[in-house]
Amino acid sequence: MKAIFITLEGPDGSGKTTVGTLLNQKMEEAGIDFIKTREPGGSPISEKVRNIVLGIGNEEMDPKTEVLLIAGARRQHVVETIRPALAAGKTVLCDRFMDSSLAYQGAGRDMNMEQVLQVNLYAIEDTIPDRTYYLDVPAEVGLARIAANKGREVNRLDKEDITYHEKVQNGYEKIIQMFPDRFMRVDATKTPEEITTIILADILKQLT
């Protein structure tokens, strides 16, 4: 069984974290040798940057600062966690990666998406996901889920208005057009269990 780099993407409230937890369990049951990680974060240094980028109280952060901080954290994550796992023959399951920067900072902050892409390609070099699962849910549905989930950790980006989240969603649509072979769109209005079953079936195909 080969090792591949898998990422989960989607707007806030898409159920991505819940699906990631279920997928972790099902991949273990399937006997897949893998690690699960996340962004921003995924390594000790990168987790420190995560706290800065997502921290409540940092609302005055300049958009370009946000891009560069996340790209720096991503570089450290790639070097310290992702590449070593792949080199050891382990599949990597990552909650968010560079596509989140293109959607949230590029599209969401009205920045040049091509420039954001180039910054991230500089950071990750050839460590590009083999397969990306996009959990597709309308922005208003996602925000309603966040509001209803009282136990969820609220971060700085959750406090953005509906217009920002719609821009993020439009950004994802552009990214899917840029990398159609890498993306698989999954209807995130389905239950987490249904979504997990769909994704796991495709992962098993990718690994054979």
UniProtKB/Swiss-Prot annotation:
Keywords: ATP-binding, Kinase, Nucleotide biosynthesis, Nucleotide-binding, Transferase. It holds the Pfam family Thymidylate_kin. Belongs to the thymidylate kinase family. This is Thymidylate kinase. Phosphorylation of dTMP to form dTDP in both de novo and salvage pathways of dTTP synthesis. Its EC number is 2.7.4.9. CDD domains: TMPK. InterPro entries: P-loop_NTPase (IPR027417), Thymidylate_kin-like_dom (IPR039430), Thymidylate_kin_CS (IPR018095), Thymidylate_kinase (IPR018094). One of its GO terms (biological process) is dTDP biosynthetic process.
